[in-house]
Swiss-Prot record:
GO MF: 4 iron, 4 sulfur cluster binding; aspartic acid methylthiotransferase activity; metal ion binding; protein methylthiotransferase activity
Gene from which the chain derives: rimO
Sequence ranges assigned to domain Radical SAM core in this UniProt record: 143-381
EC number per UniProt: 2.8.4.4
MTTase N-terminal domain sequence ranges: 16-126
Name this protein carries in UniProt: Ribosomal protein uS12 methylthiotransferase RimO
Alphabetical UniProt keywords: 4Fe-4S, Cytoplasm, Iron, Iron-sulfur, Metal-binding, S-adenosyl-L-methionine, Transferase
Family as reported in the entry's similarity comment: Belongs to the methylthiotransferase family. RimO subfamily.
Domain TRAM: 383-448
Listed Pfam families: Radical_SAM, TRAM_2, UPF0004
Biological process according to GO: tRNA modification
Cofactor: [4Fe-4S] cluster
Residues that, per the record, bind [4Fe-4S] cluster 2: C157, C161, C164
Length: 448
């Protein structure tokens, strides 16, 4: 009997590799994840280094002039290290600036232009599709650790703050239908995510543009409304943390959900200032007394509520009296977590035309005074947690023990909870621990 040689196995060409540099806010990080998920589904591999990539994507930030400089520097580094670079993100709105600075760039697209980014990658490195190899998890690819994820619920913003150019970059508010948000959230939780960080430009305005329209999720109607969305997310069994909330009156409605433990008692509200005169110049809500009343009401309804906020010092026209007003307001408001920025002009912002520029040395001095003032407030509020048993989400474990976060700590921007000697834990574990020491930012606890 004669033997027949088996046909040679078909050899597939190596999958093209894409590298990415993601700059800016968590919302931009979500954009990067969506782009990578799409590319991975088409057979591309993700490279963790410049030299291993066939093309590099740089997702830029263009919010501040300093962020533009950082983005241009990152583009330059990618060109130097790899040479094949596609630019996307907020700075992509200024394609002329990018091409003037870096003419070697292969393509430039604007923010949340996913189709254009993917098409640009196709032009540079055509995809190699194989249905057996190009498997993507249903929750998509993420750039965060496995146990937490950012959930973007809308794009753009309807506010017109004079220091901000986001509406000119990302447009007016465009909310995602509630069923799409909930479907994504369910996939994330099913994949092991323990914490959902809800982000947008204005989270509390969610659904306004849709007129709170209903959509169907699991054969029942769900409304595109801030409270309804929080209620739905609170039933998924994961931590739900609310970021970028505007101090609208209807925020009061979510406080009971926090008191019931369905949503984390944590609000990230960028107040920006307290002086009515400065807030008016910023085109921000200027009723400082009503906001203080609202804060007191929130804490009465949910004593564990943690408030994070950001402020700007040195805004054009800010006087010493305005700044002292802000310090006094902080003493009364008792903000738990605070970030502060020295004002800097942003190309295209209306604030550039406001008279009374504050000298850089005065901005610096006020920044230090505010941070020192706030440190004492934060320290006292942290000390009040000593002796309390809290739930801790573990972020990292090494030979010294575990590092995690409580309800009061958002990743990257807030403090940590240290559990010394707890080396048997793993990332994503939720454990109970009693706080025995604190400083202005962090806590030390022993496992219960």
């Amino acid at each position: 009997m004669s033997e027949t040689a088996a046909p040679a196995a078909k050899t597939l060409a190596p999958a093209p590799k894409v590298g990415i540099v993601s700059l800016g806010c968590p919302k931009a990080l979500v954009d990067s994840e969506r782009i990578l998920t799409k590319l991975r589904s088409e057979g591309y591999e993700i490279s963790g280094s410049y030299d291993g990539a066939d093309v590099v994507l740089v997702n830029t930030c263009g919010f501040l002039d300093s962020a533009k400089t950082e983005s241009l520097d990152a583009i330059g580094e990618a060109i130097k290290e790899n040479g094949r670079v596609i630019v996307t993100g907020c700075l992509g709105k200024d394609a002329e600036l990018i091409r003037e600075t870096h003419p070697q760039v292969l393509a430039v697209t604007g923010p949340h232009q996913y189709e254009q980014v993917v098409a640009a990658v196709h032009d540079v490195v055509p995809p190699r599709h194989d249905p057996y190899l190009d498997l993507v998890p249903p929750q998509g690819l993420r750039l965060t650790p496995r146990h937490y994820a950012y959930l973007k619920i809308s794009e753009g913003c309807n506010n017109r703050c004079t220091f901000c150019i986001i509406p000119s970059i990302r447009g007016d508010l465009v909310s995602r239908p509630a069923n799409l948000v909930l479907a994504e959230a369910e996939k994330l939780v099913k994949a092991g995510v323990k914490e959902l960080l809800v982000v947008s430009q204005d989270t509390s305005a969610y659904g306004v543009d849709l007129k709170y329209a209903e959509s169907r999720h699991r054969n029942r109607p769900v409304r595109a409304r801030f409270l309804d969305l929080c209620q739905e997310l609170g039933q998924l069994g994961a931590w739900v943390r609310l970021h970028y909330v505007y101090p609208y009156p209807h925020v009061d409605e979510v406080i009971p959900l926090m008191a019931e433990g369905k949503v984390l008692p944590y609000l990230d509200i960028p107040f920006q200032h307290a002086s009515p005169r400065v807030l008016k110049a910023m085109r921000r809500p200027a009723d400082h007394e009503r906001i203080l009343e609202r804060i007191k009401g929130w804490r009465a309804g949910c004593p564990d509520l943690t408030l994070r906020s950001t402020f700007i010092v040195g805004f054009p026209g800010e006087t010493e009296e305005d700044f002292q007003f802000l310090l006094d307001w902080l003493t009364e408001a008792q903000i738990d977590r605070l970030g502060c920025f020295q004002y800097e002009p942003v190309t295209g912002a209306k604030a550039n035309g406001i008279p009374g520029a504050v000298p850089d040395e005065v901005k610096e001095e006020r920044w230090h005074r505010l941070m020192q003032h706030q440190q004492a407030i934060s320290d006292a509020r942290m000390q009040a947690r000593i002796g309390r048993s809290i739930e801790v989400l573990i972020d990292e474990v090494d030979e010294d023990g575990a590092t995690g976060r409580s309800w009061a700590d958002a990743p990257e921007i807030d403090g940590n909870v240290f559990l010394n000697g707890e080396t048997d834990l793993k990332q994503g574990d939720l454990v109970k621990a009693t706080v025995f020491a604190t400083d202005a930012y962090d806590a030390w606890a022993e496992r219960d």
